[in-house]
Amino acid sequence: MNFVVIIPVRFFSTRFPGKALADIHGKPMIVRVMEKALDSGADKVIVATDSVRIAQVVSSERSSGEVYLTRSDHQSGIERLGEVAANYKFPDNQIIVHLQGDEPLISPIMIRQVANTLDSVKSTTGMATLATSLHSLEEACDNNVVKVVINMNNNALYFSRSMIPWNRGYFDNHPDSRPSRILLRHIGIYSYQVNFLYHYIKWTESPLEKLEQLEQLRVLWHGETIYVSVIDNVFNISVDTPESLRRVNMLFGND
């Protein structure tokens, strides 16, 4: 199964400017993420950025990873993916994995899994993602942790920063309980077929997406489906603050 990984990244992150080049145990974070993608077995790995500085860092690596300088007027990572896909002239059925540039601990197995998932359901949907069970009420109540509700066919019903679904009356009476397996944490990695990607970037921004600040809600708003593969034993930390960077460096140091 053939798939391509694209890592959209910009230098001026709102919460943590310059984090793409933050040092993680001797290497810039974007390089660490690219290495994970290369280990996934992808046919091609492309870093998509509007930053010359980031492009130079990636280009200096002696690896098979590529870099593509995008326009600077994109409003989102998905728009960068669209520009890259069009420039490379990928076929309509090509599977693209959208990997965030702040995921240096992501497992290469997960990267391949989200591609395999879409390959298995591509006749019914153009987009797939991953989720895992929530492990604590603290995690379930954290608005930085995105939750997802799925139906019996594993299609997403809704994504939210709030705890969904809410078990009426139970959590109030059992505050120390573990969430049930039906409560899922979304893992922010996606796979798309190229023709679906082109539709996605043409859709207008939805009210729900603006409210939650979750771009994937645009797909549900426009009546399309997102297939969600539920996986176990996931450990991952996104680097979005200096504190999370320190935690990741400690984990790399313990390898």
List each language-model region with its residue ranges:
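N-terminal glycine-rich phosphate-binding loop and ensuing alpha1 helix
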Residues: 2-49
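Hydrophobic/aromatic residues located in beta-strands of well-ordered beta-sheets
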Residues: 5, 45-47, 96, 127-128, ...
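Short, acidic/turn-prone active-site loops that include or flank metal/cofactor-
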Residues: 11, 71-77, 233-235
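A conserved hydrophobic position in a structured secondary element of the catalytic/binding core
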Residues: 49-50, 106, 192, 240
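Short phosphate-binding loop-to-helix
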Residues: 52-116
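Conserved core of the sugar-phosphate nucleotidyltransferase
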Residues: 107-204
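Conserved alpha/beta core of the MobA/IspD/sugar-nucleotide pyrophosphorylase nucleotidyltransferase superfamily
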Residues: 173-255
